Amino acid sequence: MKIGIEAQRIFRKNKHGMDYVVLQEIKELQQMDTTNEYYVFVKPGEDRCVESTKNVHVIELNCPTYPLWEQWALPHAAKKYGVDILHCTSNTAPIWCNIPLVLTLHDIIFLEPRDKQNHSLYQNMGWFYRRLDVPRILDKCRRIITVSNFEMENIISKLNIPRERMAMIYNGYNDWFKPLDDKNDIYKRYIPEEGYFFFLGNTDPKKNTERTLVAYSKYLKLSDVKRKLLMADLDKEYLDGIIERNQIDNIRENIVMPGYIVNNDLPYIYNKAFAFLYTSLRESFGIPLLEAMACGTPVITSNTSSMPEIAGEDAILVNPESSDEITEMMLRLEKDQDFYEQQKQIGLERAKLFSWRKTAEKLLKLYQEVYSEIYQQ
């Protein structure tokens, strides 16, 4: 069986969620499957995070734009190398492609009503491209994979896809996310002192950055400790806008924004955090939830979409539209030591249910099922 895997962006330096998912899937398949042939199609970049092996061939395709790479370069290369199945891993796929397709559709947020907040040019272009592409490829996909039961039911309901063509495969997390020796000081590259709140906010409205910062402002007014807030992926201009709109100038001197945090440093960041805030309005899965829990860091997360499914019913679940609820749980973790220790243990046990090996095993089984349906009838 020859399997093509679209992994366009995994060689870029600053990777994001979907990039890490396909990268870990490839690495696990590379270790566990020496029988089938894999052709991994990527765009050239500075981070060569996976190399070719005997049966895994990394093919670099140079093309100026994402749509052109996916719609023209990818199907031509897949045909050239004679793949039996082409797995497109990041929500979209080539419209004109005669090779049987498997699609990972992480979410359908792009089909849901948009809020009135400003979006970046990159976000707008991605939104329009997905809205154009996805409706045109769904009927051509032999299987559509998604990453949580919440998202699967959402996709089936809104896109009217037969259940038998859907597959739910949970993501995993890397095994270096674990409790670490207290002596490490790598966190100091980003923030001077440990015991901070950690938040991966950005400009995407679904990340709920503005409301979370309002909650943090309320926390600072009520707390005797006044812990710092470490935030990644947010620039000063965007922060200034939030502060001015909400009149929360008291947060300025307590927020640390180092910019992009290298993935290899994240285990140290989680370990030295007092708690992790994952208060999104909407997520299809939430790998950072698992990473924090696996490090023994208490998590405050939302009671919406997939987050209760991933974090578990015993996790700290709040209404993400209520800054008061977020503040309340920040303070409770700080004041109630028994509750704090209980949440650490709950997270450690919950994280054990997920792994990239389990993800890859289910993915390989799906490839085999699709191949049998097509070629062994």
Regions found by a protein language model. Name each.
Residues 1-377:
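Carbohydrate transferase catalytic cores enriched for Leloir-type hexosyltransferases
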